Amino acid sequence: MAKRQLNRRQNWRIEKIQGERAARAAKRESSAVEALEGGDLGPEQTGLVIAHFGVQVEVEALEGELAGSVSRCHLRANLPALVTGDKVVWRAGNQGIGVIVAQLPRTTELRRPDSRGQLKPVAANVDMIVIVFAPLPEPHANLIDRYLVAAEHAGIRPLLLLNKFDLIDEQNAPALNALLAVYRTLGYPVLEVSAHHGNGMEQLQQQLDGRISVFVGQSGVGKSSLVNSLLPEVDTRVGPLSELSGQGTHTTTTARLFHFPGGGELIDSPGIREFGLGHVSRSDVEAGFIEFNDLIGTCRFRDCKHDREPGCALLKALEDGRVQQQRMNSYRSIIASLPESSY
């Protein structure tokens, strides 16, 4: 059944109610912080945000007597929005509730637009973005390329991970092999694993060790199953594929950070079906297609749109086979999705 469209007044009323609720929650949180700071708080120490729950976060102590322990913390009102992976300065309270007093600088930040088009960080200090896809639901190069552009734009190393490779058969093998060949030719690291059978999981663990990684990909590709295989002691609920859409049902409800025994961390985030790139410019997208690097700026016309213009270096490379048609299609699709202000 089609979703009911809301008129302007209904949208305004919903936003007004949500704003009032947020204001009341912020006031309650401010009162709680004041009460804590009025009592006995421990010394300032560094911590790592491992989960976010509305106006509170879970912080793992990184030093001192509490090192390794986890505390629920309030946030001071003057702090920016925190996300999983943030390093912070916090103070412990007497009753297991602490207060975050400062955010430490981020080395990297993974952001995406929310439902209103506003940029929101989803993970911080990430070293590697693992782009997960599977034979089912059918992988789309355009979505993979959007993740790659986001990774290049954020300065985060990407890893392409084909999960459920045991589901490859005579029907889907040609398309999957062709898809993987494109990225291997470009030099992107590609792994094929099966979280269900365990194949390739040791090689994946080697890639994850020593890094802070985040798994991204549409629902149903097995991100939660991968976490369960890598960290058997963690109970991440797994939802079945929808019989109607072939896409997975959302299971993980909040980004959470897990430690691997051999070193390194994983941030498991909710499935993302469409990764928006409204915050990037045309030049950012061009830079995200690494095979374009030596071609951009060599077209006959400075304002070349790489469409049908004579003397276009990208079109010549496409004709020569140095640029794959699949990648050019993705590039054009991403460019077409950008707001005009990004041009």
Swiss-Prot record:
GO terms for cellular component: cytoplasm. GO terms for biological process: ribosomal small subunit biogenesis. CDD domains: YjeQ_EngC (cd01854). Keywords: Cytoplasm, GTP-binding, Hydrolase, Metal-binding, Nucleotide-binding, Ribosome biogenesis, RNA-binding, rRNA-binding, Zinc. Pfam families: RsgA_GTPase. GO terms for molecular function: GTP binding; GTPase activity; metal ion binding; rRNA binding. GTP binds at N163, K164, F165, D166, G217, Q218, S219, G220, V221, G222, K223, S224, S225. Binds 1 zinc ion per subunit. Its cofactor is Zn(2+). Its EC number is 3.6.1.-. Zn(2+) binds at C299, C304, H306, C312. Residues 116-275 form the CP-type G domain. NCBIfam families: PRK12288.1, ribosome small subunit-dependent GTPase A. One of several proteins that assist in the late maturation steps of the functional core of the 30S ribosomal subunit. Helps release RbfA from mature subunits. May play a role in the assembly of ribosomal proteins into the subunit. Circularly permuted GTPase that catalyzes slow GTP hydrolysis, GTPase activity is stimulated by the 30S ribosomal subunit. This is Small ribosomal subunit biogenesis GTPase RsgA. The gene is rsgA.
